């Protein structure tokens, strides 16, 4: 071979060698150094299945699971993988149209990027889930993911336990992107307050897909998987049997019941009427059910136990007595000559049910007979107390006592949206009366009226203070967090603090008030609250109620108020009952409270109580004006729907559709008031369009 040919051969070999080295180096770079293409390949072959954790279980005081978990399925979409897709078949299977399909896919890509799985449809109904599983290979980019949902086995405690729902973009932003699209979080009740405890930690499972988009097995034996961590449980003071009794007796009623263990502040039961089944806010129909509850003018979503503001009425009188005793204004033997009405302010009000002076000859009798004149006078003595220099200073001192009893401030219960109630300060009266007012101006504060407002929780807590002779623990549900951490301890410590707000008041003074409250049950207005062989201390109340309807303030039936604790010598339960528009407190509040106290203290109820229980569970005491208000709100909503859609199906029941489509022109008569024709709209429409389920408690 010539020298020239040998050189050319070497050059060609060298070129091949260099080219081979370059190719090997590039392959090494692509496959080892850079993970870009391996990631693309993996994304096409492997589905990262999100594993949602089970939320923590909530237990009652006896260890019964009152909030548990069940499994449903979410349909997830990864928009970037939706290719070669039979959209029409998919839409037919999912019972949606193509416009809805395109909208959901676009929203998923926008909110969570095109390469991340996002919820396409949450909580599939079982039949739809089965149809999808049979055809999943036809729909690349879609997959089913298990979703633990909440299950309420006792159908009770809806407002207290709360509910969960999918996080919103605002929730994600507030969390610093801790949450992702598709995550659920507590939205109300204990679910919201203890979210960090209950939520757990999501996991990821990598699953291989075949060329037909079917999930066929774990990728690399699961070495890249992350296990989901279940949430931790809560042990509560709630007695679910007591809770069920309370809710059944509040069926078809508006009001609330709160029962507390005085020695711990643990809430034994809390019911708010109208009641509803908490399972309505879980599962595939939850949004429809939520809308129904929101549009109910009776406000079932409003937890009246902590958000309802009521005049305490005569249930306030034991508190007023303790203020007067501690200020040295009276002794237990102090009497007042009442002849049926209070005349010291010259107006003969408030009236009293008794007209013989002996019924208020001392404090014990005044409490037992609920003398309005006696307690009105005690308030005026406190407000006009000379040692404070004037009515404004005396009033503010009186108000400080009420704040110590827990009125007019948030107690700090472990539920969201607690109302503080209302005890007006002097600025309210200065503004209303232009600085010219006296203790006669607001004298009915002494009997729990005027501008005073308290929640049922505050009233029950005030009974705890009397039962404990001066102290209380912040009312709360949770007794223990499973696997308690330092952060949990910091959260729980505020419920372990003993608030000695009125322990300086002597036992003798507390005993005088408690004796009077016992007499209320023995021979007074709370005789129907008596429990054999148990000393019960109680006070009834009846508070006036008004509402605004059709632009007018109308008088409704009175609210029935009731407070109690038992046993007198070793109190184990304190209770407050409010039944709106039910009338006398002893007739409705007393028996409801007795049945609950009897059940808790004896673990059963007598035949007499059982018979009464049947009556209270089947009697409808829903305020009559709510039916009128619901009709009004629904007619306004139907009118708005017709104006937006021209769909008359919702409005026919309220008015003649012909008059809406073609309003008749009314002939005007000279000299007469020619009012416009109202079409499916009642007066003061704007008030109820803004807050359709709101009505005023006064």
What are these regions (language model features)?
Residues 210-215, 219-226, 263-314, 319-582, ...:
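Beta-lactam-recognizing serine transpeptidase/beta-lactamase-like catalytic domain environment
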Residues 488-496, 612-622:
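Intrinsically disordered, low-complexity charged/polar segments
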Residues 1-287, 309, 331-334, 394-402, ...:
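Periplasmic/cell-envelope proteins involved in peptidoglycan metabolism and beta-lactam response
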């Amino acid at each position: 071979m010539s020298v020239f040919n040998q050189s050319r051969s070497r050059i060609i070999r060298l070129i091949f060698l260099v080219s081979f080295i370059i190719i090997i180096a590039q392959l090494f770079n692509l496959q080892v150094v850079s993970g870009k293409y391996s990631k693309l390949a993996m994304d096409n072959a492997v589905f990262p299945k999100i594993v949602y954790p089970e939320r923590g279980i909530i237990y009652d005081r006896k260890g019964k699971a009152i909030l548990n978990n069940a499994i449903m399925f979410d349909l997830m979409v990864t928009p970037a993988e939706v290719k070669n897709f039979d959209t029409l078949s998919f839409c037919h299977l999912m019972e949606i149209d193509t416009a809805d399909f395109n909208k959901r896919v676009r929203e998923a890509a926008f909110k969570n990027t095109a390469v991340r799985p996002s919820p396409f449809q949450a909580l599939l109904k079982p039949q739809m889930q089965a149809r999808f599983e049979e055809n999943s290979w036809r729909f690349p980019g879609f997959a089913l993911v298990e979703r633990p949902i909440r299950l309420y086995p006792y159908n009770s405690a809806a407002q207290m336990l709360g509910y969960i729902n999918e996080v919103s973009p605002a929730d994600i932003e507030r969390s610093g992107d801790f949450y992702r699209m598709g995550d659920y979080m507590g939205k109300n009740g204990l679910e919201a307050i203890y979210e960090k405890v209950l939520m757990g930690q999501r996991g990821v499972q990598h699953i291989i897909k075949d060329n037909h988009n079917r999930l066929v097995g774990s990728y690399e034996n699961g070495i890249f998987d992350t296990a989901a961590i279940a949430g931790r449980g809560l042990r509560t003071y709630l007695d679910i049997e007591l809770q069920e009794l309370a809710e059944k007796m509040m069926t078809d009623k508006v009001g609330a019941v709160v029962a507390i263990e005085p020695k711990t502040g643990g809430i034994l039961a809390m019911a708010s009427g109208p009641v509803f089944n908490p399972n309505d806010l879980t599962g595939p129909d939850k949004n429809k059910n939520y809308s129904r509850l929101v549009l109910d003018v009776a406000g079932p979503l409003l937890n009246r136990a902590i958000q309802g503001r009521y005049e305490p009425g005569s249930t306030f009188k034991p508190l007023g007595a303790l203020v007067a005793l501690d200020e040295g204004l009276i002794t237990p033997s102090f009497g007042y000559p009442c002849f049926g009405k209070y005349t010291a302010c010259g107006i003969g009000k408030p009236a009293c049910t008794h007209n013989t002076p002996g019924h208020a000859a001392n404090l014990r009798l005044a409490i037992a007979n609920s003398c309005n004149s006696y307690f009105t006078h005690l308030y005026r003595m406190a407000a006009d107390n000379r040692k404070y220099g004037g009515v404004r200073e005396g009033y503010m001192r009186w108000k400080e006592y009420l704040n110590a009893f827990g009125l007019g401030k948030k107690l700090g219960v472990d539920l969201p949206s607690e109302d503080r109630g209302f005890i007006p300060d002097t600025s309210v009266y200065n503004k209303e009366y232009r600085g010219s007012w006296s203790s006669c101006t607001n004298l009915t504060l002494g009997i729990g009226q005027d501008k005073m407002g308290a929640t049922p929780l505050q009233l029950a807590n005030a009974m705890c203070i009397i039962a404990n002779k001066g102290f209380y623990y912040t009312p709360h549900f949770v007794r223990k967090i499973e696997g308690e951490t330092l952060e949990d301890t910091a959260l729980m410590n505020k419920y372990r603090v003993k608030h000695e707000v009125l322990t300086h008041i002597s036992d003798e003074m507390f005993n005088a008030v408690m004796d009077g409250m016992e007499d209320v049950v023995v021979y007074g207005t709370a005789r129907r609250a008596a429990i054999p062989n148990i000393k019960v201390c109680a006070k009834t109340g009846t508070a006036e109620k008004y509402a605004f309807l059709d632009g007018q303030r109308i008088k409704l039936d009175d609210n029935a108020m009731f407070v109690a604790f038992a046993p007198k010598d070793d109190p184990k339960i304190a209770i407050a009952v409010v039944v709106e528009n039910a009338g006398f407190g002893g007739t409705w509040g007393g028996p409801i409270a007795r049945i609950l106290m009897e059940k808790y203290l004896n673990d059963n109820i007598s035949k007499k109580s059982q018979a009464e229980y049947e009556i209270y569970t089947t009697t409808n005491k829903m305020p009559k004006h709510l039916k009128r208000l619901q009709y009004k709100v629904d007619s306004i909503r139907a009118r708005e729907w017709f104006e937006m859609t021209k769909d008359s199906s919702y409005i026919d029941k309220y008015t003649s559709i012909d008059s809406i489509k073609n309003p008749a022109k009314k002939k005007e008569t000279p000299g007469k008031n020619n009012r416009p024709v109202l079409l499916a709209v009642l007066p003061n429409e704007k008030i109820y369009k803004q807050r359709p389920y709101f009505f005023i408690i006064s």
